[in-house]
Amino acid sequence: MAAEEMHWPVPMKAIGAQNLLTMPGGVAKAGYLHKKGGTQLQLLKWPLRFVIIHKRCVYYFKSSTSASPQGAFSLSGYNRVMRAAEETTSNNVFPFKIIHISKKHRTWFFSASSEEERKSWMALLRREIGHFHEKKDLPLDTSDSSSDTDSFYGAVERPVDISLSPYPTDNEDYEHDDEDDSYLEPDSPEPGRLEDALMHPPAYPPPPVPTPRKPAFSDMPRAHSFTSKGPGPLLPPPPPKHGLPDVGLAAEDSKRDPLCPRRAEPCPRVPATPRRMSDPPLSTMPTAPGLRKPPCFRESASPSPEPWTPGHGACSTSSAAIMATATSRNCDKLKSFHLSPRGPPTSEPPPVPANKPKFLKIAEEDPPREAAMPGLFVPPVAPRPPALKLPVPEAMARPAVLPRPEKPQLPHLQRSPPDGQSFRSFSFEKPRQPSQADTGGDDSDEDYEKVPLPNSVFVNTTESCEVERLFKATSPRGEPQDGLYCIRNSSTKSGKVLVVWDETSNKVRNYRIFEKDSKFYLEGEVLFVSVGSMVEHYHTHVLPSHQSLLLRHPYGYTGPR
């Protein structure tokens, strides 16, 4: 008997309801029951679940066709099935509960549709619990449901005599929160249909997904909040939608500089170009020619980089003479050879500093001759400062616009969110040039509105209770600000959920962010091109299904002011 007790089955993590029902043997009972919510936010909710008792494990699904369970637990260590009189309400007339021998473990509450159903479920659960312990109690079955009620419940509700030690149930059970029942759904019927079209199809792909998720099961010490539908693996696709800045950034760079792809491979100096474009410092002028001369010198001294490395002094003196006579030829060669000469300096940095003083002198001697050529190779790294020198006279016309008090703030707006490389991070560079010709007040407001959402707003969790805990931690007294908000991952489907603290009801409110045709919305009538513009809208417009709730404070963000 003791050897048998050590082999209590462990709930299977990802199995469809139909697959479980068709497994040979082991299914004691299956049917629909109402299950009490497991989190603090859902204690008053009793969603309908399809429950299967299989080999002394209880599984519950959203429906009989679900691809994976909402949760499951082993009956190991549970020693009593009782009526739950304290949970009886007008909606739950026939509740019952399954109690663990240890008070540290969860008590599970279910509600049947009739007295007969409750007797049947309780009798079968009692039989499963006593499988290894009380062979004499096995005659308890559904036929007892027709017997006297008091005698039936007296026999069923008697605790099973078991010992606690052999049951390692801490990390075997798991539960997926029924959070989709707690969302504030849109008032109009159309968004509901849109949700069906958008969200129901992904419910079936998850069955193959749990395989990469399997390492996560061992990481969960207490399993009552485990997410089994695999939203974790499905979530990476949405961030690329909001994280497109990186791709867009590369595209913008390629438009800005056609030779950028070539430079990206050989040299780490590429980041210098964007800096010069947006904020050209005059201090870089003497060093830029120095950076430009080594490529000219390497090509004029020898056709390949190998002869250049042995004798640095001799090559440098001869290159000075050659450069004085053939500067234009070398600069033309640079356009085709600038990839090859930049390879060696990365592998042999010491020679470059040794020769740099001579290059700088040469650069000081020949600035007029070089200034005539930069038009040919504006794309390379070095020619940027000369190219920017030319527009300086034009800049003399700009001071009339630039002295505006708003404009100096724009650089701060670009750099202020240290944690926010958002998909709008480069949107400032486009409006800034046209805005110089326009009147200042309106454009500066537009630029301000395009500040990206900080990364701290996106919380990497699927639990509303976890977000509530984070919100309360922001205040010493545990009272979050009204309108404090963040965006978390959805626990049931691929997508995002807007979580807002409602001070009037002293709780968080969840709004699923729907998406269709690259548009985002909380309710069907108002569509937005991005999550950022949607959040901006609800800073000044009341959220759906509420009288006065606005988005006011992004979580974890302290402004630059």
Swiss-Prot record:
Residues 202-213, 233-242, 342-354 have a biased composition (Pro residues). SMART domains: PH, SH2. A motif (SH3-binding) lies at residues 201-210. One of its GO terms (biological process) is signal transduction. Transmembrane segments: none annotated. PROSITE patterns: PH_DOMAIN (PS50003), SH2 (PS50001). This is SH3 domain-binding protein 2. Residues 457-555 form the SH2 domain. Residues 160-316, 333-451 are annotated as: Disordered. The modification Phosphoserine is found at S278, S416, S427. The modification Phosphotyrosine is found at Y174, Y183, Y448. GO terms for molecular function: phosphotyrosine residue binding; SH3 domain binding. The keyword Phosphoprotein applies. Disulfide bonds: none annotated. It is linked to Cherubism: An autosomal dominant syndrome characterized by excessive bone degradation of the upper and lower jaws, which often begins around three years of age. It is followed by development of fibrous tissue masses, which causes a characteristic facial swelling. Binds differentially to the SH3 domains of certain proteins of signal transduction pathways. Binds to phosphatidylinositols; linking the hemopoietic tyrosine kinase fes to the cytoplasmic membrane in a phosphorylation dependent mechanism. CDD domains: PH_3BP2, SH2_SH3BP2. The keyword Phosphoprotein applies. It holds the Pfam family SH2. Expressed in a variety of tissues including lung, liver, skeletal muscle, kidney and pancreas. Phosphorylated. Phosphorylation at Tyr-448 may stimulate the activity of the LYN kinase. It comes from the Eukaryota. Residues 252-266 have a biased composition (Basic and acidic residues). The gene is SH3BP2. Keywords: Disease variant, Phosphoprotein, SH2 domain, SH3-binding.
